[in-house]
Amino acid sequence: MAAADAEQAVLAKQETKQDCCMKTELLREDTPMAADEGSTEKQEGETPMAADGETNGSCEKSGDPSHLNAPKHTQENTRASPQEGTNRVSRVAENGVSERDTEVGKQNHVTADDFMQTSVIGSNGYFLNKPALQGQPLRTPNILTSSLPGHAAKTLPGGASKCRTLSALPQTPTTAPTVPGEGSADTEDRKPTASGTDVRVHRARKTMPKSILGLHAASKDHREVQDHKEPKEDINRNISECGRQQLLPTFPALHQSLPQNQCYMATTKSQTACLPFVLAAAVSRKKKRRMGTYSLVPKKKTKVLKQRTVIEMFKSITHSTVGAKGEKALDDSALHVNGESLEMDSEDEDSDELEDDEDHGAEQAAAFPTEDSRTSKESMSETDRAAKMDGDSEEEQESPDTGEDEDGGDESDLSSESSIKKKFLKRRGKTDSPWIKPARKRRRRSRKKPSSMLGSEACKSSPGSMEQAALGDSAGYMEVSLDSLDLRVRGILSSQTENEGLASGPDVLGTDGLQEVPLCSCRMETPKSREISTLANNQCMATESVDHELGRCTNSVVKYELMRPSNKAPLLVLCEDHRGRMVKHQCCPGCGYFCTAGNFMECQPESSISHRFHKDCASRVNNASYCPHCGEEASKAKEVTIAKADTTSTVTLAPGQEKSLAAEGRADTTTGSIAGAPEDERSQSTAPQAPECFDPAGPAGLVRPTSGLSQGPGKETLESALIALDSEKPKKLRFHPKQLYFSARQGELQKVLLMLVDGIDPNFKMEHQSKRSPLHAAAEAGHVDICHMLVQAGANIDTCSEDQRTPLMEAAENNHLDAVKYLIKAGAQVDPKDAEGSTCLHLAAKKGHYDVVQYLLSNGQMDVNCQDDGGWTPMIWATEYKHVELVKLLLSKGSDINIRDNEENICLHWAAFSGCVDIAEILLAAKCDLHAVNIHGDSPLHIAARENRYDCVVLFLSRDSDVTLKNKEGETPLQCASLSSQVWSALQMSKALRDSAPDKPVAVEKTVSRDIARGYERIPIPCVNAVDSELCPTNYKYVSQNCVTSPMNIDRNITHLQYCVCVDDCSSSTCMCGQLSMRCWYDKDGRLLPEFNMAEPPLIFECNHACSCWRNCRNRVVQNGLRARLQLYRTQDMGWGVRSLQDIPLGTFVCEYVGELISDSEADVREEDSYLFDLDNKDGEVYCIDARFYGNVSRFINHHCEPNLVPVRVFMSHQDLRFPRIAFFSTRLIQAGEQLGFDYGERFWDVKGKLFSCRCGSSKCRHSSAALAQRQASAAQEPQENGLPDTSSAAAADPL
């Protein structure tokens, strides 16, 4: 199949070039080329013009009138050559290299030998007049360089052998079409046409530095590289095919892969952030009571939440207590009524009636099952029981007898008579949920009907009715149902008092004594339940008991049929491992935990069968213990110790949830209750379905951290509220959804719980509270327990208010560290922004909450330099509000103090505004720019004087702040101060001292431009001059990206790009872009790895817009633009230079060499060659970047013989190997204030070395005047020694 795919890929490449196999071909063609950077490049060119009086090739005159007045050359008025037409027909390979015919010459460039052309417009805007009968060159050469035989250019590192030799360069301007693959066209094909023609001028070009090792690599035959291509083809093809397969995963339906509340969150996160007003309009069309409501059941209509969900979910956070709670006699249905998986269908009629009730401003209270024997026997009288049975029987008889199955497979819980009755009523065609009874429906029932007595008392008086009620559920099991057995046993084991009553009534139990002992249902299987399967979040719900510690299984689920060890335990979705262990009776029916490791009882009715259970979970009937699996006497069982199992796949529960296991015998039925209070508490605290079924906010596989609820009064209050719900029947209250918001804000835990039980939507938003949710209110007040309750009940943890505030923002702004920790651990996003662009870090920094800021930064997901809509960073907010310790913290975390806001103020401006001299000193010690001016021309001294901040004024004056600097209004700091104030006096004195010493002229650094990039860079680049009166250079156009003035035919076809399909940060070895670069060369901070070869830098292929990774992946650095603080300044002897305003670590991206993309032939006719950078193409046409007329700050970077920058070829938006982007990375630690420099290359100095010398000042300078003189002396001495070989011997023989 792989061979067939490869053959099909090759065929598709030959025919259509648009098949997905183009990715495979591109990998096969590009990878060897990326590794072949050291191969020999054929370069050609002509002798260039010299620099205009500046040194190191980066300095020119302030203006160039000839260029400024020249007409611009546009693409529209360019006439294509015949070769260009051929090139359009030729095929372009996926790697960007043209696969044109070998006879095709250079395209899109003016040939120098065409004397029939009388007038041509060059790409630089000049008219190129060429008389047909004259042999003049296209440009009049400068007198200084007319006789220079070299062609200088800045070059890339790793190819010293690629520079053109002076002896091979032609002396005529005539050229012939270049034949690719046949060597240098200029050196072989150019032939003189007349002996009297002028000598062509070769242009100076900056190049990549060449190493000695590069000479050997460059000298290798190209065929050797091609030999290595073959074994890589199959590997690359497989990699590409795998990448394509990863692009087409089979995703399940959204409602099947996530609970509906998760789907709600997943969609509303992005929608809320992008279209807040559209969402608000859409939501407002609903009734106010229905705003934001959603169900926990996928693909269901909106409905109120059910009572059983809230009780069930809080079983994971309540903990058992020892003492009086054990005295309560609670029936086992306390767990099963709320733990079963009842699917309440919301019919249209039901939804309409509920909406009508909501429009009147009230929610229906949840009707607690009256027949539920959770009510303690001590507090419930027989009269109350009779009344309850009458009411429930009335409801049963009123429902029509249809007997149809409605999702019967999902309703097969046999835990209690109450659940059977409810499902029986539902299957009878009852449209209303029996859990929530609208008041008007209850009012319709004006007369009572005979009751079938389906309750705990019905077990004693009417066994026939029990069997009838059980028939509806028995169909859900695949084996013979034990419904009637369970019901009889329930009647036997309901309570201690009932046991005594049952002993006196043998007529009920005497029919079948064997059914008195409950048997397990380990081998019974219940059909799938859509609700439980969805809320299980595709994870196993098993809880393991390992040495008295409980752990959660995190394995994925394959089969969704439900299982449980007994009717006391909830229905579970299990993984294959736990399904097999369930069938082997390794799950204790008493507590529902898997007996994994520790001390257990083991019953062996047969040699090949063993039943595991806890000693205290044995079934007890009439003071006799029995095996809860088979009913055999427990005395026959033996205690075994199972070795500790591998628990690496489990999640250990909170310490508070484990203490219930220390006394696992609390299920002892001799106390009169099959689910006594301790057993109920233990089940609630460790029930596996609670955290599984209520995980609405986190991604798949995220377990809600129940340990986030701290031990304290909130925990005790919650426990008491849950116990009250389980032991008593609360009054039928009618709550308005608005009450949930106020109760959450006031910390009324019990009321919040009751309202959630009643089904009030936890995402209800208050219209008059900026559409804030109860979670906003709880987070704002710091009620962690209520936050946990709301999140577990389905509250959207990232819900946004009208001003786009999230609950995490409210907690951070109000300094509730515990709430912040809980929300982040529960999955809240830390980087959303509110309507003003502020994150939670901005809000906390503004208020000075040190601990919150420290925790947010330690989380690792927060950007310490994030800016809001005003451009203000957390550092600026902390500075303005005088939070000194917070400023120190942010500075230690890497905060950039020179980031400018929208008005180009830096932190020092805001320190002057606030008047905090301590922060100002900290900022100045961190090398903050004291002379920075904002958009109004104000320096920090201006602002301090205007705000009358005397201490700051004195501090700035002591640091030599310019008191004479004028802003755009023409005001000096002295004029900004209040007349005769203390600040005015200090400024006046400073000015007088300066004026009193006119004989000591001090060079004052003046800011001649606040940003030479005019805002095109993310970080402004100021220009200063402290040497002379030269203004900021204006004889060029600043551009932040490469530009063209003539067609270059760069292959930007997105289908030709090789791309990755990474889901991580692209740091793994499987990233396709990293493989093209041999590996990802960036670390997590965006710096080059230490093993990066600075001498011969490899090609770097960054991730592009065709990749599936995120925009902030690790393999995107250069495309993020300028990040370092740079400054253009006037040097003493090298014209303009560039220096850093901050410390730049090793391997940091500094800037990119940006200019005009031109061809090699076009570079030969350019008059100014000081800004040419050779792109070092290996095959075919050679291209250059000319920063003379268009460029960025890198055009001012001077040469240095010990460079602190190295140029690297990088590919981003395209992968055309002819046009790499040149990125400068630091080769060592660059100190703040240090001048930047890179090695121009030998080719540049071969031409320019005769015009000027290098003045880098390095001890290893190779191109200084002294080094040049030494080389000339050595060169002159060698011929002399060769001409007189016997001079030394003759002198020795001379007696004189």
Curated annotation (Swiss-Prot):
Which parts of the sequence are annotated with region: Interaction with histone H3?
A: 1160-1179, 1240-1243
Tell me which residues bind Zn(2+) 1: 1060, 1062, 1066, 1071
Aminoacyl-tRNA synthetase listed as a keyword: no
Boundaries of every Pre-SET domain copy = 1058-1121
Q: What is its EC number?
A: 2.1.1.-, 2.1.1.367
Residues recorded as binding S-adenosyl-L-methionine, renumbered to this chain, are: 1134-1136, 1171, 1198-1199, 1255
Q: Which residues form the SET domain?
A: 1124-1241
Name of the protein: Histone-lysine N-methyltransferase EHMT1
